[in-house]
Structure formats: structure tokens, C-alpha cells
Amino acid sequence: MKSQKKRPINSKNIKNNQEPPRELIQSIINTFSKGQKKEAIIELDALIKDYPLAPLLLNVSGSFCKSNNQLDVAVTKFKKALNLDPNYAEVHYNLGITLRELGLIEEAIKSYKNAISIKNEYPNAHYNLGNALVIIKKYNDAIKHFELAVVFNPKFAQAYYNLGLANKSIENNFEAGLNFDKALAIKPDYAEAANDRGVIFQNVGDIENAIKYYQKSLAINPNVAKVYNNLGIAEKYLNKIDDSIKSFEDAASVDPNFARAYYNLSGFKQYTFNKDQVAAMQSIHMSDSVNQFDLIAINFALARANEHLGNQDKFLSYLHEGNRLRKKELNYSIDSSYKSFLNIYETFSLLPNPHNKSLQNITLTKRPIFILGMPRSGTSLVEQIISSHEEVFGAGEINILKKIYSQITRNILPNEKEKNILSEENLMLIREKYFDSFAHLSTYHNIITNKTPENFKYIGLIFSIFPNAKIIHLKRDPRAICWSIYKSNWGGKGYRFSYNMDDLVKYYSLYSKLMDFWHKKFPGKIYDICYEDLTTNQEKETKKLLEYCELDWDENCLNFHNNKRAVKTSSSLQVRQKMYQGSSEAWKKYESHIQPLIDGLKPYLKT
């Protein structure tokens, strides 16, 4: 005779068909919570002997084990409870929490989903599922579950905050800002949310409000180095040098191991580190427990500090080490750049010019000016000059074109046709998307500059969207450009080619050849300006620049250093100074130490 499959037993199918006494269970939990853990566990084990088929007791037992950091035992207890009652949502949830602590993210996700499938209106399960999805970088999926968490619990401040972080991770600044605002509305003393609200304001160029929220965060919790560091960066963008230095010093004071504070202080040429600061930097550098991010930052900081002191050997040693570590961290290969440039050629080589004449006849309410070239070529300086004109607003670096290009080449734009991704219909959508990226700007100006250097890759896209666009291309001695790039520790994953001299030479070659391609494809439409000519003949070159942009003469453009706008680039300090010459010669001091770079760039020197 076949044995019948046993029916799962729920919490009512136990001793004498009764549930364990709830009052007794709560009493045991209270005992455990008071710190009398051993007594509570003894009482619970005795109760389990009386009610061996009660999943509720196994759930409590698993929770006790988890609290005692007996994670593997807790997993066993939760799984036993689920064998008795597979539809016990809370146990699936607790199992997910424990698996997450064990680092078993995929298994944790499965458990959270099981809990939600049984009990959809379960805000904590949606919240923790969102957190797990963030770990594996599935941000859009995470956002859906954070949104459900706040639907089912509208007062869930932490869920709003993490929803903001997820939106921030995909550069959805508008939504992230709203989420942080909601978290703060529920919990006004939420220091982390105030800090990240400041970050969002900074991301969109509203530096004054960024400072306000950093200060609010510090008023709530004055012991967070990261927030002082953020405040210092924002103050630097507004040329509040003394305030900026103090904020970075405060960051290092709160946490002497906060490497980024020393790196940012090293960016001020007039700043001299004291003995305690030097000792702290060297301690970080020698530490066995320092993480890669901080080790890279401290190498660049020590390099700058020694450069300012004239210690050439130490400067170069720390600089080379910082670059070596950064290249290793990014796992960059020049082959990836070869592929991306090849994709550009394939996309635009056969495209007629102009390929969509109808767009030329559409009047724009906002007129874009693009300032581009290699990083460290002078794009910030030129934007500072042009944005000093009364009719122009300098938007800084707006990276929307890179995103748009990625979308059209991956065929994910709406309404696209298989072989016509740059159809008029799609180009209108792209144009709208470009202007949407400026929606946050508080400006009455109709002429807006975008000085993202990397936009040199997307000149074909720019002229497709804006056939009458003004494009200013910065040219500079390639030795000055590449040496300056090599000395910089760029944030995020931008400019990944920067940390190796051979990579720099090869990338410069790719850039140079692509610019030749664009000039041939769009003859007479790209305005080349030489950085050295601009610094030598400021007024003459400025007049030519404004003439190309179809702007009347404005004396303010000669006094660009008086422009009070926020400058969110590594050149924020330089553009506050009057025009100076000689910066393109800085590499000569180290020529014998960077010979591979110098030799590799010889084919691209002006003759």
C-alpha cells in the first residue's frame, strides 16, 4: 500500500490541537530582550518539546539564534519551520534576512520573494528585497520594491531613503531628490537623507542648496567625515576657499583615516600639511587594513604634497603607485576604447550630411553651445569665458549625450525603426530628452553651454539633433594634456584610460583620428581654438570665439575670473584666476621621467 503524502502541519495541528500559549511565548521573548538570553533559550527549548510541531516556536528559536550570530543554526530552524508550514510568510522573511547576513544574496532574494508571494502587503519584505537587489546592481527592480514598501507603509522613512539612493545610482536625480525630501518630511532629523539631498542638489548644479543640506546634516550629526568632505567640495565650487579648507580639515579631524580629506586638501597649492597630517597620511599609506579606494586617494595626496614641497622623487613615486593601483582597480584595457570608437565610425560613416534637413528649420527656444576636447585641454576656461557673457548660461558638464548614444546603439529608444535609429522621429525624441536634462536649471538665458569634454565622441549625434549647433573644440599641446591627466585621480569610472602612459598615448591617438573624421564629415562647422593661443592673445581669441558663437562683444568675457558661477570641475580654482601662461610647459620639469609619454605623443605635435 502506497504511503500517503503528509499534509503540512500548521500552528494549530499540535499538542492537544492547541497553539502554544501566546502569553508564555511573549514572556520568553521579553526575557531574551532583557539580556537574559540563556534563561529564555532554556524556556523556549522546553516549550518546543511540548509543541514539537509548532512552526511559530521554531521561528522564535531561529530568531534567537540569529540574534546570537548563530546564523547557520538559525537557517536550519527557519527551514524546519517552513517544512511544517510552507505558507508562513514571516519565516520566509526571517530566512531571507539571515541568508543576506551570510552573504547568500540570490538565496535571500528567493526567500523575500516567497514571503511576498504569500503576503504581498509586506513592506519590510519589499524593502529588504530592494536592498538585496541593489547589492547585485538591479536598480530598476529594487526601485519597484522600495516603491511598494512605501505604498504599504507610507511612513517608512528608511524605504524612501533607500529608494532615493537607488534612483541616485541610475542618475535619476529628480526622483532621488523627491525621495530624500519624503524621508526628511517623515524624519526631520535624518542626517543621512539630508546629506544625500545635498548631493543631489550638487549633482544638478544647485550648489547653494547643496551647502544648506550638508550643513543641516552636520547640525544633526556633526561626527561624519564624509559630510564635511562633501561640504568642502561644494564650497570649493563656489570659490569659498577658506571655508572649503576648514571643511576638509574638519573631515580629517573627525576621522584621521579619511583619505579623501587629505586628497582634497592637497588640491590647494597654497596649503601646507602639518606634521600630524603628514603622519596620518603615511599611517594610512602603510596600513595593512586600508581599502583600495583610500590607498589610491592617499597616494595621489602624498604625490601632490611632495610636488608642492619640491620633493621630485617622492612625488613621482607616489604618483606612479597611485596610477598603478587605480588602473588595476578599474581593470581597464585600451581594447574597450578601440571597440567604442569603432562603434562610432560604424554608426556615422555612412550617414549623409546633413541627413535630416527638416530639423534645421525648427526654431529652438534654447540654443546649445558645446565645448569639448580631451580632458585638461581648457574646456573649463573657455566655458568660464563664454558664460561671462550676459546672454549665456554655463551649465558645466552634462553627460546626457553619452546616455543617449548608448541607448540608440543598443536599440532601446522608443518608436525606432530597425535600420533608421536616427530617423526624424527619433531625433525629435532625442532633442526633447537633451533639453529635459536642463529642466532643473534656474536660468532665464536662452543660450546654454555644455562643456563635457568627452562629447567629442558624439559630434555626429550633436549635428544630427542640432544641425546648426555651435561646437568649440579645444586643442592644446598633447604633452601638457596627457601629463595633466596622468596627475589627476578622476572620480567614478570616468577617463579610465588616464592611469597608464601607454594607454594615454593610444587614447590620444584615437581622439585625434576621430576629430579628423568629424572635421572631414562636417567641414567648417567645428571651431578649433588653441589653448596656448588663447592664453597668449586673450582679447583677439576671445573676440573670434564670440563671433563664431554669434554673440556680440561683452567686456565681461575678458574678466571671466570675476564670474561668480559655480564651477564643478577639477579646474574650478584655475578659472577663478586671471589668464596666465606657461601651464602647458609644466611637463618639461619631469621630461626625463615620463619619456614613454613624450615619445609616444611626438606624431601629434604641431609642426
What is the predicted function of each stretch?
Residues 50, 84, 118, 152, ...:
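Structural marker of alpha-solenoid helical repeat scaffolds
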Residues 29, 59-66, 90-101, 124-135, ...:
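Conserved alpha-helical positions within TPR/SEL1-like repeat arrays
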Residues 361-464, 474:
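Phosphate-binding active sites in nucleotide-utilizing proteins
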Residues 266, 278-289, 299-368, 415-446, ...:
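PAPS-dependent sulfotransferases, especially Golgi type II membrane carbohydrate sulfotransferases
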